Amino acid sequence: MRPQSAACLLLAIVGFVGATEWWESGNYYQIYPRSFRDSDGDGIGDLNGVTEKLQYLKDIGFTGTWLSPIFKSPMVDFGYDISDFYQIHPEYGTMEDFERMIAKAKEVGIKIILDFVPNHSSTENEWFTKSVDSDPVYKDFYIWHDGKINNETGEREPPSNWNSEFRYSAWEWNEVRQQYYLHQFAIQQADLNYRNPAVVNEMKNVIRFWLGKGVSGFRIDAVPYLFEVDLDRYNQYPDEPLTNDSVNCPDPDDHCYTQHIYTQDMPETIDMVYQWRELVDEFHVENGGDKRLLMTEAYTSFENIMTYYGNGVRNGSHIPFNFDFLTSINNASKAGEYVEHIKKWMDAMPEGVYANWVLGNHDNKRVASRFGVQRTDLINILLQTLPGHAVTYNGEELGMTDVWISWEDTVDPNACNSDPDNYYARSRDPARSPYQWDASSKAGFTSADHTWLPVADDYKTNNALQQLRAPRSHLQIFKKLVRVRKEPSFRQGELNIQAIDDDVIIYSRQKTGSDLYVIVLNLGSTSKTLDLTKYYELGTQAEVITTSLSSQYIDGDVIKSTEFVANPYVGTVLVAV
């Protein structure tokens, strides 16, 4: 083995402990319920639709599924604006439907993880209504401020220059209370005040409630926004400094126009994550059963992400999502960039925790659209053969692509706050189109004539049923990957990875005493003939476990290790024979 890989190999051993609990080295599937399966014919996915398809997920081999928000909501931000944290959204079903889903999940052996949205509530939440009325219990449940008077005009203005993620001021005037409230997302999503112990306790009660209903954990949304800087001695909030980026962010209404040093990543945020971990651990001790899981969503600095795991004294998130492949890698990235980001994560992890890899979600363009349809299998091979946890967004296993959605049909508030010329770049709707189950009307998603978002045009040739029936398909490759990922060398084996040129990544996975696997990924547009024995003790021959649809090889082929052909955009998993 080449000396340059030795450090990575050693760190893989340190950072990748032996899997013993259900969640360790898990394979997780994100369901966007509104688009997954509609059971009642209203054009909107629901819980009974999820229940109906749990066996499908189990047959693929997933450990668990996390559901985007299912709680009662006005649906301004499609569930991320919660009006009652203790109720199911009526379009999705009833509490009885939820309990039936939990029972079915236990029957088939798949874990249910809920999306927990702690930063804000809907302005239609009873808490907010009472806060507007200055109810003594709820008066300080949200971030309220009088604003400031403009010395030149004499008019009242927002307290600071903070902008919302969805553009424009993050402060909204309330006529009843005669104050501004903070909303870091939509106007209808009021930020909760985590400096108020009553808020902290209430949100812990929400966690306890759903744990009591039988969920196996939570994916925690938008964690960096939990706390804002405290008021200064003059009872004011400071303006954030400008980014002064006239090229990438010239519009003063955009969120990127300021540096978010007062509205994100406050030190108290990490402590809150640790408190939630203590809560779920205590629940496990008190109630038994399997351990409960915390995943965290935080688009933040790499250094911050590592603190989410824990600080050596207190534990934090089991899975602080690794978004490097979303934020730092694209279809033009070279092989060395992939390897650099993989090594960076593996090198930095605290001892005794697991890596994780997130390649897609409901907030980003789909994998096949970002990296190219021709790389669909290659990217899934990468995801499923790296150490640690794999997180798949619904539809990526089929190679679903983004759907073009007109300005008139756009419903995402992030895009709707833009204009007809710029909305599409901001819109998250294209990645949220209905799941493509079969070639029947509306892709088998619904019996309705209309769906909440348009169905993709290619559903008749690209759907789950067609791919299940085909001898070779994206889904068949994905299923093979999930199966082989359960082998000891993938669950507990060493990682030895390198880029041999700008296009080709090669790495091995092996546990002592178990099979040696070699993975070859050719990101480029030209074939490469490789002598794999120069890099790994593979022997003269190797067997193809699985490979991309466009490969010249098929599963089961025995190839010469010294003359392996890596076709363009093809990934291949090999095992020594």
UniProtKB/Swiss-Prot annotation:
Residues carrying the site annotation Transition state stabilizer: 363
Active site positions, chain numbering: 221 (nucleophile), 297 (proton donor)
GO biological process terms on file: carbohydrate metabolic process
Listed Pfam families: Alpha-amylase
Transmembrane domains' residue ranges: none
Keyword NAD: no
Glycan-bearing residues: 119, 151, 244, 315, 331
Documented EC number(s): 3.2.1.20
GO molecular function: alpha-1,4-glucosidase activity
Enzyme class, spelled out: hydrolase
Hydrolase recorded as keyword: yes
Keyword terms: Glycoprotein, Glycosidase, Hydrolase, Signal
Catalyzed reactions per annotation: Hydrolysis of terminal, non-reducing (1->4)-linked alpha-D-glucose residues with release of alpha-D-glucose
Record's signal peptide: 1-19
Superkingdom of origin organism: Eukaryota
Family recorded in the similarity comment: Belongs to the glycosyl hydrolase 13 family.
Record-linked PANTHER family: ALPHA-AMYLASE FAMILY MEMBER (PTHR10357), MALTASE A1 (PTHR10357:SF233)
Protein name listed in UniProt: Maltase A1
